[in-house]
Amino acid sequence: MAGRRGDSEQQLLTPVRIIKILYQSNPYPKPEGTRQARRNRRRRWRARQRQIREISQRVLSSCLGRSTEPVPLQLPPLERLSLNCDEDSGQGTEGELGSPQIPVEPDTVLGSGDKE
């Protein structure tokens, strides 16, 4: 069983080292030459940075076995959402400051959405 933990750490460090080498291979351009030459060098540098970023995402997804994209969050339908404040959710304090909330129908606050 010895060495198991090191294997997983090595498996995680390998893609990190590859990505580090990729970024180090593309240093920021030197600020010399005419304005147009500097602009062109920066433009080419940004294009290379985009390519490195894409390659890095591919390396991570292939080495770690999962996508780098975040998992989409499932939200309830808008029809089920409300602005009702009279429901006690159990959060907050006992002695809240200010006047009590007056329950209002959402249609009166938001309107029907029709232009007058």
UniProtKB/Swiss-Prot annotation:
Q: Which Gene3D superfamilies match?
A: 6.10.140.630
Q: Where is this region: Disordered?
A: 25-49, 82-116
Q: Where is this region: Homomultimerization?
A: 18-26
Q: Which UniProt keywords apply?
A: AIDS, Host cytoplasm, Host nucleus, Host-virus interaction, Methylation, mRNA transport, Phosphoprotein, RNA-binding, Transport
Q: Where are stretches of biased composition, namely Basic residues?
A: 36-49
Positions carrying Phosphoserine are S8, S99
Q: Where is this motif: Nuclear export signal and binding to XPO1?
A: 73-84
UniProt motif Nuclear localization signal and RNA-binding (RRE): location: 34-50
Biological process annotations from GO? mRNA transport; viral process
Can you quote a single GO CC term? Answer: host cell nucleolus
Give the InterPro entries listed for this entry: REV_protein (IPR000625)
Name the predominant localization. host cell
Q: How does it assemble?
A: Homomultimer; when bound to the RRE. Multimeric assembly is essential for activity and may involve XPO1. Binds to human KPNB1, XPO1, TNPO1, RANBP5 and IPO7. Interacts with the viral Integrase. Interacts with human KHDRBS1. Interacts with human NAP1; this interaction decreases Rev multimerization and stimulates its activity. Interacts with human DEAD-box helicases DDX3 and DDX24; these interactions may serve for viral RNA export to the cytoplasm and packaging, respectively.
Remarks, anything else?
Answer: HIV-1 lineages are divided in three main groups, M (for Major), O (for Outlier), and N (for New, or Non-M, Non-O). The vast majority of strains found worldwide belong to the group M. Group O seems to be endemic to and largely confined to Cameroon and neighboring countries in West Central Africa, where these viruses represent a small minority of HIV-1 strains. The group N is represented by a limited number of isolates from Cameroonian persons. The group M is further subdivided in 9 clades or subtypes (A to D, F to H, J and K).
HAMAP family cross-referenced by the UniProt entry: REV_HIV1
Q: What does this protein do?
A: Escorts unspliced or incompletely spliced viral pre-mRNAs (late transcripts) out of the nucleus of infected cells. These pre-mRNAs carry a recognition sequence called Rev responsive element (RRE) located in the env gene, that is not present in fully spliced viral mRNAs (early transcripts). This function is essential since most viral proteins are translated from unspliced or partially spliced pre-mRNAs which cannot exit the nucleus by the pathway used by fully processed cellular mRNAs. Rev itself is translated from a fully spliced mRNA that readily exits the nucleus.
Q: What is this protein called?
A: Protein Rev
> What species does this protein belong to?
Human immunodeficiency virus type 1 group M subtype K (isolate 97ZR-EQTB11)
Primary gene name? rev
